[in-house]
């Protein structure tokens, strides 16, 4: 419980730091990388303050699930890669094989869909929360809690929560509830208790930290789909630029083409007449 509390505190501060950056990338993986750097900075500052809020173990970024003592041979879950995991040694654990535990954190974007097939608020459930209950993914195995981070890029929080919970119910998962100390400026904490039939221990407490990043990406009227289209525009411009350069290199303007040809022709005639007139 103490490790969870410290991890959540560090990530809450790191998300605030992320939100205050002058610019941010749009894509999930790039946001995760920025958040990783923020979390390390926050943890370093807390360790220097020496108030017992920092964590001396290393935060792991995009690392595979570690082997679990209950798995006698290598399993599929060991090939899965959570966004973050923060290990610790549970000294209260009687079994030395089970003393090493990992707090797993998965991150997803939240808001309106970027396309008809990529729906963020559904993806948060299907490719996020479910990884903590699906044995093939096995996130949080042998741990009592884990976390999800949501990057809000547009839409209001209440509308997002309704859509996420609608998708959770359709996947036979419990609702996410606003935590008692949930709403802070730009950061919202929510809680969810999962029953895990095929992963121990159960029940499992999944914490949710949602950060409001809308101010980084858009005018109030723009959707995620419009943002995605704008992000792709520079690539089209570069393509045009390359085409133009190719055109300039391979097909000079007509006047430039005609002049060298006339000059070359005269040059050849001159040489011929010089050869005929010693």
Where do the PLM segments sit?
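C-terminal tail/extension regions appended to the core domain(s) of diverse proteins
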Residues: 1-29, 39-50, 72, 118-122, ...
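Residue-level detector of short, conserved catalytic/binding motifs and their immediate flanks
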Residues: 80-82, 103, 146
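Conserved catalytic cores of phosphodiester-cleaving nucleases, focusing on short active-site segments
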Residues: 84, 101-112
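Eukaryotic short linear interaction motifs
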Residues: 93, 112-114, 156-159
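Short amphipathic alpha-helices and their capping/turn segments at secondary-structure boundaries
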Residues: 82-96
């Amino acid at each position: 419980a103490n490790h969870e509390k410290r991890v959540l505190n560090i990530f809450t501060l790191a998300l605030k730091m992320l939100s205050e950056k002058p610019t941010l990338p749009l894509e999930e993986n790039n946001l995760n990388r920025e958040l990783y750097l923020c979390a390390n900075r926050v943890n370093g500052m807390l360790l220097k303050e020496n108030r017992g809020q920092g964590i001396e173990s290393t935060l792991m970024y995009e690392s595979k699930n570690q082997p679990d003592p209950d798995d006698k041979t290598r399993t599929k879950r060991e090939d899965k890669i959570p966004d973050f995991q923060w290990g610790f040694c549970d000294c209260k654990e009687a079994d030395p094989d089970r003393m090493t535990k990992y707090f797993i954190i998965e991150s997803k974007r939240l808001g309106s869909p970027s396309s008809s097939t990529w729906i963020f608020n559904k993806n948060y459930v299907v490719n996020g929360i479910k990884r903590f209950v699906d044995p093939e993914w096995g996130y949080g195995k042998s741990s009592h809690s884990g976390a999800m981070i949501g990057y809000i890029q547009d839409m209001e929080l209440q509308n997002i929560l309704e859509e996420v919970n609608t998708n959770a119910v359709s996947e036979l998962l419990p609702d996410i509830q606003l935590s008692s100390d949930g709403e802070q400026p730009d950061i919202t904490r929510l809680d969810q208790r999962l029953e895990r039939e095929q992963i121990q221990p159960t029940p499992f407490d999944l914490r949710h930290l949602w950060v409001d990043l809308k101010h980084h990406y858009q005018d109030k009227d723009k959707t995620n789909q419009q943002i995605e289209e704008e992000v792709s525009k520079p690539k089209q411009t570069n393509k045009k630029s390359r085409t133009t350069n190719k055109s300039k290199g391979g097909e000079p303007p007509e006047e430039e083409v005609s002049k060298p040809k006339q000059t070359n022709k005269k040059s050849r005639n001159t040489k011929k007449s010089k050869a005929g007139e010693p």
